[in-house]
Amino acid sequence: MNELDGIKQFTTVVADSGDIESIRHYHPQDATTNPSLLLKAAGLSQYEHLIDDAIAWGKKNGKTQEQQVVAACDKLAVNFGAEILKIVPGRVSTEVDARLSFDKEKSIEKARHLVDLYQQQGVEKSRILIKLASTWEGIRAAEELEKEGINCNLTLLFSFAQARACAEAGVFLISPFVGRIYDWYQARKPMDPYVVEEDPGVKSVRNIYDYYKQHHYETIVMGASFRRTEQILALTGCDRLTIAPNLLKELQEKVSPVVRKLIPPSQTFPRPAPMSEAEFRWEHNQDAMAVEKLSEGIRLFAVDQRKLEDLLAAKL
């Protein structure tokens, strides 16, 4: 059995890609997209029809050019998501504009709009996850959306404080970023030789997984942002893992036994009182890596969102 099939015995495998053809190849349960992945996919000629449709929609649904571009961007994200859902049996994650990461109300508004666009294409909201950055405002937006039956995927998650606040808000799923945590520590104190058990990104997800299971939180833990297959194999047993096509390929090509590494702890504990905003901000601020990586992640997604807008504006 290849490693990818081995992992699938214990973990739901999700494709981290906007490239519909590569998703088709690996038979994942779900797929996740983000502005960077959409920008990459939008540059491929086989998806031109999805872009043309989004442009036509933008022209029809915006008075100013700025409004048309925003409308086209939203439609493009949904077009890709709807195509992906023809292939995967589960859900697709679609991201709210990263520039709204500190605006709870506008994040809620954008999420509802994306769900509405999906429903106009005949996609039920039970097949959509709305991706929001794990800021205090993003978590509060998700808390409200969950009450409306709109499930959320809280992304750019780097600190334990973020993970705890998400669980306490009752969000559907979190995406702790293994690779970006690893990058930060590797740049400061390179691990040589590499020992996966000591990988700070792997340890972070393991801690969150154990904490959630010990306190009976139902929020799904989906490890994300991997740099190497060792990280993925070390988290086999995690609820879900979202994996880029290049790493899915490596796992599919290697035949070796896969052992479950994450197992729910037998000991359980009562849940603590929910964190206040002040506690959350303080705890998160104590983690220099998380502060830096959350800020950087929001900025990078915003840059790619703007590039996507420029690409569409040129076609309007």
Curated annotation (Swiss-Prot):
PROSITE patterns in UniProt: TRANSALDOLASE_1 (PS01054), TRANSALDOLASE_2 (PS00958)
Reactions that this protein is recorded to catalyse: D-sedoheptulose 7-phosphate + D-glyceraldehyde 3-phosphate = D-erythrose 4-phosphate + beta-D-fructose 6-phosphate
Location of the protein in the cell: Cytoplasm
Annotated EC: 2.2.1.2
Molecular function as annotated in GO: transaldolase activity
Gene Ontology biological process terms from the UniProt entry: carbohydrate metabolic process; pentose-phosphate shunt, non-oxidative branch
Main location: cytoplasm
Active-site annotation: K131
NCBIfam families assigned: PRK12346.1 (NF009001), talAB (TIGR00874)
Subunit structure: Homodimer.
Physiological role: Transaldolase is important for the balance of metabolites in the pentose-phosphate pathway.
Protein name per its UniProtKB record: Transaldolase A
Organism: Escherichia coli (strain K12)
Gene: talA
